């Protein structure tokens, strides 16, 4: 490994914190994850372009996520494009939306397609990514029992409990 944190010439640098999105890709396909995150091989497709377009609104930072100790039970939270990290967990994630009220918060992750007709209404990689977002919120002191996957094409919100 080189002194600048890279594996070798032509490879992507090793991140200090593991992005939740990288874990999503690994759960979906370990080989594809390696090609994308280690080899740096990635090409846009019509699906990824659609996904980028679907995220335009949520990628615009709006609203503020108050520190957990300042989030009062009667305060409504609606904050977009929030980045959270934890050295203890070794994770970093960009949360599309964090909603909250009555002292609890809930991450909402946007997906471009329609809700899949699978048990639980969500694919496993998305479930894992959302669980990591919940863990990060808890690590920052928030009360969080799960999240929501919002499917843009079908305009459906699917709750995902996290123990």
Ranges and model annotations:
Residues 1-107, 114-118, 128:
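Metal-dependent nuclease catalytic cores that hydrolyze phosphodiester bonds in DNA/RNA
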Residues 2-8, 88, 120-121, 136-163:
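Metal-dependent nuclease catalytic regions and adjoining charged, substrate-binding loops involved
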Residues 110-114, 151-153:
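A short beta-strand motif that forms part of the nucleic acid-binding face
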Residues 123-127:
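Short, conserved loop/turn and helix-capping segments at secondary-structure boundaries
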Residues 128-135:
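Short amphipathic alpha-helical face segments that pack within enzyme cores
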